[in-house]
């Protein structure tokens, strides 16, 4: 993928298996509120280095799974061609956030420091839990810090004292973890 492509589009879901003979297909949403995926249209897929626009026409829920009817997809074999493709959106369709709210895409690749400005590592991913999100931080090559991933609760302001998305920097405090 080109850098430009990565900067414009964001993966928010994935197509699953075709359902029935009329062209319906399962969709697995990655959005926090699963049904919000339908607020972000049009959708796109990347196929053989080309971006293809996908327009959902109808959707319904069957056994906790979204079934979607796509414009111009009228039978099972057409729907099967979409199976396992990531569903992308243009990042400009995302709503503006309030202060101290962040999209995961903006947190990933941030450098994490402690309050003494010691670099602890870089955020590689986030994990959603019922109580709070968790930063997965790839440790830096610093004495007394292991090469294992650090799991840091994303609790602002209890543990996270600063998030600067523009500078890709997160500062943590009050964090007691043994890095052995």
UniProtKB/Swiss-Prot annotation:
Entries under InterPro entries matching the protein: PRC-brl_dom, PRC_barrel-like_sf, RimM, RimM_N, RimM_N_sf, Transl_B-barrel_sf
Domain named PRC barrel: residues: 99-179
Alphabetic keyword roster: Chaperone, Cytoplasm, Ribosome biogenesis, rRNA processing
GO-annotated molecular function: ribosome binding
GO BP, sorted A to Z: ribosomal small subunit biogenesis; rRNA processing
Keyword rRNA processing included in the entry's annotation: yes
Cysteine-cysteine disulfides: none
A Pfam family: PRC
Gene Ontology CC, one term: cytoplasm
Localization per Swiss-Prot or TrEMBL: Cytoplasm
Self-association and partners: Binds ribosomal protein uS19.
Family as reported in the entry's similarity comment: Belongs to the RimM family.
Domain writeup: The PRC barrel domain binds ribosomal protein uS19.
Biological function: An accessory protein needed during the final step in the assembly of 30S ribosomal subunit, possibly for assembly of the head region. Essential for efficient processing of 16S rRNA. May be needed both before and after RbfA during the maturation of 16S rRNA. It has affinity for free ribosomal 30S subunits but not for 70S ribosomes.
Name assigned to this protein: Ribosome maturation factor RimM
Organism: Buchnera aphidicola subsp. Baizongia pistaciae (strain Bp)
Gene name of the record: rimM
């Amino acid at each position: 993928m080109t850098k430009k492509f990565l900067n414009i589009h964001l993966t928010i879901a994935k197509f699953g298996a075709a359902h029935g003979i009329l062209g319906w297909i399962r969709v697995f949403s990655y959005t926090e509120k699963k049904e919000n995926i339908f607020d972000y249209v049009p959708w796109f897929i990347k196929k053989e280095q080309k971006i293809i626009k996908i327009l959902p026409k109808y959707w319904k829920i069957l056994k906790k799974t979204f079934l979607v009817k796509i414009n111009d997809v009228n039978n099972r074999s057409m729907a099967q061609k979409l199976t396992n493709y990531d569903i992308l959106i243009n990042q400009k369709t995302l709503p503006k956030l309030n202060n101290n709210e962040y999209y995961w895409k903006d947190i990933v690749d941030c450098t994490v420091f402690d309050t003494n400005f010691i670099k602890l590592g870089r955020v590689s991913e986030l994990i959603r839990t019922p109580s709070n999100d968790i930063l997965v931080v790839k440790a830096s090559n610093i004495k007394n810090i292991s090469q294992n991933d650090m799991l840091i609760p994303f609790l602002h302001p209890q543990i996270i004292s600063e998030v600067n998305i523009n500078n890709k920097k997160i500062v943590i405090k009050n964090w007691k973890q043994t890095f052995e």
